[in-house]
Amino acid sequence: MASSSSSERWIDGLQFSSLLWPPPRDPQQHKDQVVAYVEYFGQFTSEQFPDDIAELVRHQYPSTEKRLLDDVLAMFVLHHPEHGHAVILPIISCLIDGSLVYSKEAHPFASFISLVCPSSENDYSEQWALACGEILRILTHYNRPIYKTEQQNGDTERNCLSKATTSGSPTSEPKAGSPTQHERKPLRPLSPWISDILLAAPLGIRSDYFRWCSGVMGKYAAGELKPPTIASRGSGKHPQLMPSTPRWAVANGAGVILSVCDDEVARYETATLTAVAVPALLLPPPTTSLDEHLVAGLPALEPYARLFHRYYAIATPSATQRLLLGLLEAPPSWAPDALDAAVQLVELLRAAEDYASGVRLPRNWMHLHFLRAIGIAMSMRAGVAADAAAALLFRILSQPALLFPPLSQVEGVEIQHAPIGGYSSNYRKQIEVPAAEATIEATAQGIASMLCAHGPEVEWRICTIWEAAYGLIPLNSSAVDLPEIIVATPLQPPILSWNLYIPLLKVLEYLPRGSPSEACLMKIFVATVETILSRTFPPESSRELTRKARSSFTTRSATKNLAMSELRAMVHALFLESCAGVELASRLLFVVLTVCVSHEAQSSGSKRPRSEYASTTENIEANQPVSNNQTANRKSRNVKGQGPVAAFDSYVLAAVCALACEVQLYPMISGGGNFSNSAVAGTITKPVKINGSSKEYGAGIDSAISHTRRILAILEALFSLKPSSVGTPWSYSSSEIVAAAMVAAHISELFRRSKALTHALSGLMRCKWDKEIHKRASSLYNLIDVHSKVVASIVDKAEPLEAYLKNTPVQKDSVTCLNWKQENTCASTTCFDTAVTSASRTEMNPRGNHKYARHSDEGSGRPSEKGIKDFLLDASDLANFLTADRLAGFYCGTQKLLRSVLAEKPELSFSVVSLLWHKLIAAPEIQPTAESTSAQQGWRQVVDALCNVVSATPAKAAAAVVLQAERELQPWIAKDDEEGQKMWKINQRIVKVLVELMRNHDRPESLVILASASDLLLRATDGMLVDGEACTLPQLELLEATARAIQPVLAWGPSGLAVVDGLSNLLKCRLPATIRCLSHPSAHVRALSTSVLRDIMNQSSIPIKVTPKLPTTEKNGMNSPSYRFFNAASIDWKADIQNCLNWEAHSLLSTTMPTQFLDTAARELGCTISLSQ
């Protein structure tokens, strides 16, 4: 190892030395030789040293076998990092010119990779950290893109380049629209070497490298590449890179980071470096007071879009949650506007769906990585994370395209946006791609999960933020809890439109009924409809409208038609498209029609219901000559044919008629003639060739049948008289019910006035080859006939409860003499002079406040007509009269008196129910006294009063009771607190009212309405075994009354079959729960459940009488012989009860519970429990 002479270079003596031999196998000998050669190299570090090392590398590489020189070069960089560029640059030159091909196991690359991953902890040192930093710094500096086309390069060079980097992913340098993108392929030949070094290095080296390379950390100075300084900034355990770095690293760093991470994915199919790079880019690094000035802050995010896309495609929700919260909680020195950065990150991920190839984001990435983290942060209630998450949610909701992408950004599908008139096809085009539908479904499910998974307080706060983001609540409102930065810098709310709301329909499908979240989305829907109507029918004065009509009639008509298309598209989608289920679409169409009526009333300056106007017009026209009638009709059409209600009606008319025509044509085209149900139904699946396109015809007829079933189901649901539980612009009182009745009355009036609709519906009733269409059309036909007068009378006569509260004094004394004569019932005439003292309507009057005295009719004259007008001036008087204490009971004439009063003022029946219902809820529990029974006192007396009102006006009063019960009835959930006990008491009283109404068989109208409320009856009998007999007994009483109501209903003949259907379905659903009550500890419950089962079994022996001559259409449209005897008659109740008894016995035995009560009940019912099944 002696020094060479002046005439001989020092590298010439190495040609025959052990440096070029394979390394010794003995570890210690190998280490000693390496150290010796490193010290020898250090003796010649002069100006000529870089050239000598370059010549040595060019002559000795490539090499197929491992030699000691490999380790010596790597170790020399470790001991002399300031001369590292002299060793590494020749190797880089060989890689670039293709003379040396990179491989992880090739020489000398393997030695440099092993250098950054020491075999022992003792090898970690300050010197080692400087060497690693120098190697990565030099490789990064020279890892610049090389553009070469296949036409300019030879086969050898192309082969070398393809082996030098196997990453096929494009970098950020070429533009997306560059014409030379396919010809010029940028290659970074040093990326594989850098990625292998980073994969072998500790985590600290990787994070510091990405921060340094992206410009986050380091001191950037202009000038040449300078050697590292001796000073160190970190400890040996946590090495950090060099602070002296040229300015070019900021511009070149993004391309290097992308290339290095892409190379790992391409060669190893792993993303370890990506998982380290993204947090290093987004989160502030740990710093001290000595080096915090070296932190440059959050880098620009756009160059790393592809990296973020890959990271969020593979990261776990917990990791992305830490990342998002860390970014939001970052100090201002790191991210002056962390909210903008987080929103930009979402924008980049959403936009990446257009161009990203390979790994794709999961369908629910928005929920997994953002919405879930936002919900968890907001559940913290206080702190920086909660406020920042709320502000981020506000930003995201203010830009709806971030939640649900526009049509052109769904899975890269190119869909051209139509102008204003292209609304009808947008949703259809979108769902043609299954991936797009899956993305929308997953995102909607994620939004619903965020709303409902963190408690009611968080749900309420999210709802208020959503409404504020959409401009429904002012930001300075006390109801909105937003950070000050959002209130100080408000954003422009999005323009409400049907396209904007379409994805929210999926969210509504996942939200629980009656939740605050559903109320929020329904409120947004109401605002959307109102916005669409304001665009379609802008409020204008008649003078301005006339002036515009004269000046630019053609232009205004074209604009109006374009604006009208959005309204029609919304109605069309809800009626026929699959964007929402039938139940949800029915509720939304209820809102659409009510908002249309409200908008039309406000525009015309009149708030009179549409049905009242129509009925008034009809009455006037009926008494006028034909010419005047035609003139009135023409004027009416001119006035009403331009509003939103007319647009709604025109769509219903066109859709029903078109579908009816198409469906009725099918049997003719299929073969004609009269078909049986099975024959024609079987031909639906057979392709019919028309003009050579059998597939298109088959799809068309299937679509027509599906659309017909859907629109009939929705129209039938609009007759249910159920108000929309949330989102309507009406008040909490009876106006909701008036609105529901108004919708049903409007649909009924539309069908009755239109001969085309009536004819189309009759044609659909004849489509017996499709049972559902036939059944629904027949049911709709009967509903129009049965309910039209009932709902119209409610709309025309009923007034809101607030009107009576405003017009009636708090306390009023009135003494009136009534002279009432019974008609056709009593021979004698009885006169009642009644003194009535009315007190406050908000409380139950104490005993003694009302005095009712009977007098003879002497001297009374004829005050009956005047008495009816003066007595009981409002609903409060009538409600107090009905609930007054009477020791002698409810005298026989009161029922007739009540009918007379309600006949004179029919609007009272509806409002009296509202007042009595409030009394029912607020009345205290009163124990029986010696003078009177409990049935005549307290809330039970209110139940009696409600039944009397229903008996007097069964149709309207029963509908009002059902709707009030649907609104007030709460889930049967066991709660020990005071609020839970109050809820139980209210439910018990409601069920008691339903029981008494079900027992009243004298009024078929009320029984029909109650039986049709199947959802209410199921809710009233739900949770029979949740608590003790306090709730179980009223529910069993309702089932008993239901079972006993079947026999009198069957006596009505065919018209009662549909009612029996609803009652039997309730009994069928609650049969298992009734069987379980047979083992209840309470003897009263066991006896009552046995009575219920006995009444159910008796129904099997009741013959169903059917008149020989049937009407054209029957209830629910089932006039075929098979339906005439109804499903209830075909139910083998005894067999069903027997099976339930067996199952209950097995269940009790499996839980080691006694079965003696069950055996006793089975013997009483005549059943035998078999345990062999």
From Swiss-Prot:
Induction text: Expressed with a circadian rhythm with the highest level 10 hours into the light and the lowest level at dawn. The peak of expression in long days is slightly lower, shifted later and the decrease is slower.
Tissue: Widely expressed with highest levels in inflorescence apices, young flowers and young siliques.
Composition bias, Basic and acidic residues: 854-863
Keywords, alphabetical: Biological rhythms, Cytoplasm, Developmental protein, Differentiation, Flowering, Nucleus, Phytochrome signaling pathway
Primary location: nucleus
GO BP field: cell differentiation; circadian rhythm; flower development; positive regulation of long-day photoperiodism, flowering; red, far-red light phototransduction; regulation of circadian rhythm; regulation of DNA-templated transcription; response to blue light
Ranges where the record places region Disordered: 150-187, 604-641, 840-863
The organism's place on the tree of life at top rank: Eukaryota
Subcellular location: Nucleus; Cytoplasm
GO cellular component: cytoplasm; nucleoplasm; nucleus
Disulfide bond sites: none
Annotated signal sequence range: none
InterPro entries: GIGANTEA (IPR026211)
Quaternary assembly: Interacts with SPY. Interacts with ADO1 (via N-terminus) and ADO2. Interacts with ADO3 (via N-terminus). Interacts (via N-terminus) with CDF1. Interacts (via N-terminus) with TCP4.
Cited function: Involved in regulation of circadian rhythm and photoperiodic flowering. May play a role in maintenance of circadian amplitude and period length. Is involved in phytochrome B signaling. Stabilizes ADO3 and the circadian photoreceptor ADO1/ZTL. Regulates 'CONSTANS' (CO) in the long-day flowering pathway by modulating the ADO3-dependent protein stability of CDF1 and CDF2, but is not essential to activate CO transcription. Regulates, via the microRNA miR172, a CO-independent pathway that promotes photoperiodic flowering by inducing 'FLOWERING LOCUS T'.
UniProt record similarity statement: Belongs to the GIGANTEA family.
UniProt protein name: Protein GIGANTEA
Lineage: Eukaryota, Viridiplantae, Streptophyta, Embryophyta, Tracheophyta
